[in-house]
């Protein structure tokens, strides 16, 4: 799964459409960047852009946009209702998929340093990227706004993190940083504004003040009345949905409303939402209601129903979930997303990757998928009704393993490519030689870890496959037989890929440990596959 970072730069121009479009163009023309939204405000004279992409791409996209802004925006003439201090006022980086906040901090640091060096402007780090507590919040950095910068920059306490401590009239200053994804989530009530606000005060982290904190961490909240819909809302901002989830806010609001004898009539998501936030809610309701729902589309539909996300307007996942708006990979990348014909063609081409490691991962992924298939061919049928509970338990591990193993098809090829890149590093000086040696050793360890992960993943499936062989739909006997051999073959391939990469690793203790482990996994695969085949051969109709 590719990494995805959201970038939300705020530029101090909301009236001149040519400038707004030029900045949009700079972002969309950056390879790897997908522009999701452009929100221009004439009264604030400010435009908020939302775009996503891999970490290195969004940094380039933000820089390209800033270059255009430096030519077209003159802060000495800027007027607007929104607080501001620079042509590019603020530029946060936000993790969406496969990226940590710490990695987004690195994005902010790289962007801030390059922006300051190229445009010779002052840049401050805020949020999770802040280097001192006094700069964690944007209002603290922006205090006094653009007009205060000439004197502020002369103070030692306000020396920028990057760039000169001098006033640049046409630009001002920029703040960049990292934060978690913010979700705006409103719950609908048939009640009054005051009742909604009472609930918000009980729930939001701030509560009613220091002496009366609320129950939900990382949640802001207020109550208001939506005249056009003739209902009240508990309006919340989830500052970290992994600390307090969507379903937690909804369920707690329902509990508060019940105590006030108020009906909750659905909810509303404002803006875009990460897929994980909805899948976490789906997992909660599946467990709470003992539901067996495997497909992502159906799990999203469940959440839309349980939270009433379509109560005020249609909720289209394809238009509201960030990951659905962004292609997983470019057309030239992603073995796992290619057709079978294209994948086989690449394997057969005159290149070292994809090779045996990717083929082993693909075989194991298909073996796990066959296990899932047999489980589903058993589940929900009247003649196997007594096995429904068992199948509910057995099917998910196969589906999860199949998805994980599919990612290893690409991971193996990428590990090999990274090793080749290390091979090409210069080795003219002692320092370069040391750097190259370290990179080669790291590349070899990565090349070992991928097939080892494959073998470990398959090992976790043998108990489930044994049980499926004993009680699964016998009409699928041959499918389970193929599954057993495909999984064994995957481990077989992993074993030899580990060995060939261990050969040049210099850490002997590491080599011995990994060799012993992968040998054990191969022997286990041979034994377990044979047991599955024997069980299937002896089973009677």
Swiss-Prot record:
A Pfam family that the UniProt record links to this protein: FTCD_C
- Which EC number applies? 2.1.2.5, 4.3.1.4
Report a single Gene Ontology molecular function: microtubule binding
Coiled-coil intervals, chain numbering: none
Task: Give the start-end ranges of region Linker.
Answer: 327-334
> What lineage does the source organism belong to?
Eukaryota, Metazoa, Chordata, Craniata, Vertebrata
Q: Where is this region: Cyclodeaminase/cyclohydrolase?
A: 335-541
A single GO BP term for this record reads:
cytoskeleton organization
Leader sequence range is: none
Which sites are catalytic? 82, 412
Q: What is the effect of changing residue 135 to C?
A: In FIGLU-URIA; mild phenotype; decreased glutamate formimidoyltransferase activity; 61% of wild-type activity
Q: Which organism is it from?
A: Homo sapiens (Human)
Reaction(s) catalysed by this chain, per the record, are: 5-formimidoyltetrahydrofolate + L-glutamate = N-formimidoyl-L-glutamate + (6S)-5,6,7,8-tetrahydrofolate; 5-formimidoyltetrahydrofolate + 2 H(+) = (6R)-5,10-methenyltetrahydrofolate + NH4(+)
Its annotated pathway reads: Amino-acid degradation; L-histidine degradation into L-glutamate; L-glutamate from N-formimidoyl-L-glutamate (transferase route): step 1/1
Protein's recorded name: Formimidoyltransferase-cyclodeaminase
């Amino acid at each position: 799964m590719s990494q995805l970072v959201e970038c939300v730069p705020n530029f101090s121009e909301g009236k001149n459409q040519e400038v707004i479009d030029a900045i949009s163009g700079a972002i969309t023309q950056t390879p790897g960047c997908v522009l999701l939204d452009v929100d221009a405000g004439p009264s604030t004279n400010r435009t908020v852009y939302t775009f996503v992409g891999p970490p290195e791409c969004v940094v380039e996209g933000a820089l390209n946009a800033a270059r255009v802004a430096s030519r077209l925006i003159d802060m000495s003439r800027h007027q607007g209702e929104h607080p501001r201090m620079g042509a590019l006022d603020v530029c946060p980086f936000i993790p969406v998929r496969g990226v940590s906040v710490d990695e987004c901090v690195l994005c902010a640091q790289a962007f801030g340093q390059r922006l300051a060096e190229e445009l010779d402007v002052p840049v401050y780090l805020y949020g999770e990227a802040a280097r001192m507590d006094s700069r964690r919040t944007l209002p603290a950095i922006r205090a006094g706004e653009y007009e205060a910068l000439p004197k502020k920059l002369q103070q030692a306490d306000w020396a920028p993190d990057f760039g000169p401590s001098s006033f640049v009239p046409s630009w001002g200053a920029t703040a960049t940083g990292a934060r978690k994804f913010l979700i705006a989530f409103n719950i609908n009530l048939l009640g009054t504004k005051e009742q909604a606000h009472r609930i918000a005060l009980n729930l939001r982290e701030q509560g009613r003040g220091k002496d009366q904190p609320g129950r939900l961490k990382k949640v802001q909240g207020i109550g208001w009345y939506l005249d056009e819909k003739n209902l009240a809302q508990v309006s919340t901002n989830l500052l970290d949905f992994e600390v307090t989830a969507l379903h937690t806010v909804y369920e707690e609001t329902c509990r508060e409303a019940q105590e006030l004898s108020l009906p909750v009539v659905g909810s509303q998501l404002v803006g875009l939402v990460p897929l994980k936030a909805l899948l976490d809610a789906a997992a909660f309701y599946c467990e709470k209601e003992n539901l067996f729902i495997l497909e992502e589309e159906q799990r999203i539909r469940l959440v839309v129903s349980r939270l009433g996300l379509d109560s005020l307007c249609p909720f289209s996942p394809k238009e509201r979930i960030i990951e659905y708006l962004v292609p997983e990979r470019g057309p030239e990348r992603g073995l796992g997303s290619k057709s079978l014909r294209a994948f086989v063609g690449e394997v057969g081409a005159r290149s070292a990757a994809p090779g045996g490691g990717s083929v082993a991962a693909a075989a194991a992924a298909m073996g796990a998928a066959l296990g899932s298939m047999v489980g589903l061919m058993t589940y929900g049928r009247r003649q196997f009704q007594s096995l429904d509970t068992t199948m509910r338990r057995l099917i998910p591990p196969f589906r999860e393993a199949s998805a994980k193993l599919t990612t290893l098809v690409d991971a193996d090829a990428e590990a090999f490519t990274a090793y080749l890149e290390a091979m090409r590093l210069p080795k003219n000086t002692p320092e370069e030689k040391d750097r190259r040696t370290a990179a080669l050793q790291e590349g070899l360890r990565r090349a070992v870890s991928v097939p080892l992960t494959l073998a470990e993943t398959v090992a976790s499936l043998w108990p489930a496959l044994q049980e499926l062989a004993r009680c699964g739909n016998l009409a699928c006997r041959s499918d389970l037989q193929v599954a057993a051999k495909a999984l064994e073959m995957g481990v077989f391939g992993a074993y030899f890929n580990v060995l060939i990469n261990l050969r040049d690793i210099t850490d002997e203790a590491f080599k011995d440990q990994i060799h012993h482990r992968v040998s054990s996994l191969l022997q286990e695969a041979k034994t377990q596959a044979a047991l599955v085949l024997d069980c299937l051969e002896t089973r009677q109709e």
